[in-house]
Amino acid sequence: MVGREKELSIHFVPGDCRLVEEEVNIPNRRVLITGATGLLGRAVYKEFQQNNWHAVGCGFRRARPKFEQVNLLDSNAVHHIIYDFQPHVIVHCAAERRPDVVENHPDAASQLNVDASGNLAKEAAAIGAFLIYISSDYVFDGTNPPYREEDIPNPLNLYGKTKLEGEKAVLENNLGAAVLRIPVLYGEVERLEESAVTIMFDKVQFSNKSANMDHWQQRFPTHVKDVATVCRQLAEKRMLDPSIKGTFHWSGNEQMTKYEMACAIADAFNLPSSHLRPITDSPVVGAQRPRNAQLDCSRLETLGIGQRTPFRIGIKESLWPFLIDKRWRQTVFH
């Protein structure tokens, strides 16, 4: 069953152009996505919208005109959008996700990653909405992988600590919420700097200059569209089964260091990789990282939830507009 509302569209006919008011179908399943302007949020919004959900996204600095502008630190603004829209599901993607930024701005990061998350969980519980809180593999110390949902977290850096505190705030304020821990993400970026994976592309392309690449930390690069699919499938199963709640893990299954990712990127585009230099020492600059925080995803797999895009395919789809001789296409496709 769907609702209906009016929408204006432009109709072109030979010799004429007119503005026409038409009725459009509005799906009755409603989802609110925070951080909808970000890499993951955009994918989550698109996934729900394309699968018969009425999706509303909210952001802050980059919100207009596509999304609602909401300051998640403003409890009144959060209350109003949730009560006005009455979502069945809320996917909370908004976060400060850069470990080094969190170390340098701990109070601001804690407000967004912890305080805002707890308040959102409280508001979701008040209207009976299912909240999916996006967390991180960085809640683990990386010494004993793979990690199951019930394993005891031990974050090494402040980012991981704020995400863990955010998990606690969510589950304390909303017993029916879900926590979804995920690893490093990539996908259709607007800028290469939007992902720790895609940011390597310039170093790969500029083969006339050697580049040091980390070959110590083991990562599991995961496409945002796969995480978005997991969020939708989890939401749809929850609408049929209220026992679906608690903590879940999702991750790609290809283990790679940044050096190995860079070499795979070079291979995908038939570019040289001899200028890339593997560095096997533990990084000494920036926030401490877990060496291998591999996530065990069997709980979601048992529910029949999940999909995985092979890295070579996903990274080629994501990066081809950023080839040096194709960057003009960004104005068209991004």
Swiss-Prot record:
Signal peptide: none annotated. SUPFAM superfamilies: NAD(P)-binding Rossmann-fold domains. GO terms for cellular component: methionine adenosyltransferase complex. Pathway: Amino-acid biosynthesis; S-adenosyl-L-methionine biosynthesis; S-adenosyl-L-methionine from L-methionine: step 1/1. GO terms for biological process: one-carbon metabolic process; S-adenosylmethionine biosynthetic process. Residues 319-334 are annotated as: Required for interaction with MAT2A. CDD domains: dTDP_HR_like_SDR_e. GO terms for molecular function: methionine adenosyltransferase regulator activity. It holds the Pfam family RmlD_sub_bind. NADP(+) binds at T37, G38, L39, L40, F60, R61, R62, N71, L72, C93, R97, Y159, L185. Heterotrimer; composed of a catalytic MAT2A homodimer that binds one regulatory MAT2B chain. Heterohexamer; composed of a central, catalytic MAT2A homotetramer flanked on either side by a regulatory MAT2B chain. NADP binding increases the affinity for MAT2A. Regulatory subunit of S-adenosylmethionine synthetase 2, an enzyme that catalyzes the formation of S-adenosylmethionine from methionine and ATP. Regulates MAT2A catalytic activity by changing its kinetic properties, increasing its affinity for L-methionine. Can bind NADP (in vitro). Belongs to the dTDP-4-dehydrorhamnose reductase family. MAT2B subfamily. This is Methionine adenosyltransferase 2 subunit beta. It comes from Bos taurus (Bovine).
